[in-house]
A protein has these predicted regions:
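Flexible "arm" and connector segments at domain edges
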Residues: 1-60, 64-90
Length: 90
């Protein structure tokens, strides 16, 4: 399961270094404003899906994908996020 998330982080880093023309991923990585808008949009869609008990998995996946791209676009390193989460374990 976590391998899928790790693959997305690797994809984001790779595409940031080696862009592919026409790639949606690259569009998100190069346009911080769009990336931010998409994270907000997808979170709202997830909340709605949970409230309606419909399409929750699809919307949750969208949130993960767009959040990963947003973090990478803004040079937030996942390793640092993971370190912070580890500090919070009790």
């Amino acid at each position: 399961m976590l391998n899928t998330l790790e693959s997305l982080f690797k994809l984001a880093r790779d595409r940031k270094s080696n862009p592919i023309d026409g790639s949606y991923t690259n569009k998100l990585l190069s346009d911080k404003s769009l990336s931010k808008e998409k994270v907000l949009e997808e979170i709202n869609e997830l909340i709605e899906a949970v409230d309606k008990n419909s399409n929750k998995i699809h919307e949750a996946a969208d949130v993960f994908y767009h959040l990963i791209m947003f973090l990478e676009a803004n040079d937030v390193k996942i390793e640092e996020v993971m370190q912070e989460l580890n500090k919070r374990k009790k």
